[in-house]
Amino acid sequence: MKIKLLIIITAITLSQLVATDFTITRLKYGGGGDWYSDPSSLPNLLDFLQNETNIKTASKEIKASIGSSDFYNNSYYYITGHGKINFSNNEINILRDVLLNGAFLHADDNYGMDQSFREEMKKVFPEKDWVELPHDHEIF
């Protein structure tokens, strides 16, 4: 009986450690672009998800540099700004690895980031070309 109780308590404890609220990681980056711009965008998105879906969300975003310990606490990444992005070679390799393993990168050009973002992503995926998805693509 004591062993069964110990197993149940352990299972409940572990499930609580694993059961985390959905959140989004805002990527910090070098290059002069303002990675911190539009500070209300992610809280608003998380609030919308909480109120309009069955997804339990965290109240705050995570802010992390690529490769930092906080970076690995999530798989939904958000990048925004008004200027140049510059990833180091190490950041390029890490970003490639996480994206190839199922992570999602949400890019939001607040004006002026588009060209730089495309150039940096070409370094992440040099073998890939940008393609426009048709409106009837299954993702929509």
What feature does the model see in each segment?
Residues 3-14:
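Sec-dependent N-terminal signal peptides
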Residues 9-11, 64-66, 119:
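Intrinsically disordered, low-complexity boundary segments flanking structured domains
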Residues 17-76, 80-83:
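Aromatic-Pro/Gly-enriched surface loop or interdomain linker
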Residues 22, 28-32, 40-41, 113-140:
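An acidic, glycine-rich "communication" segment
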Residues 24, 76-115:
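Short alpha-beta junction capping motif
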Residues 40-44, 48, 90, 94, ...:
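Extracytoplasmic/secreted proteins, especially bacterial periplasmic and envelope-associated proteins
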Residues 50-54, 100, 122-126:
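Sec-exported extracytoplasmic/periplasmic mature domains
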Residues 56-64, 107-110, 128-135:
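Surface-exposed patches in mature extracellular/periplasmic domains of secreted proteins
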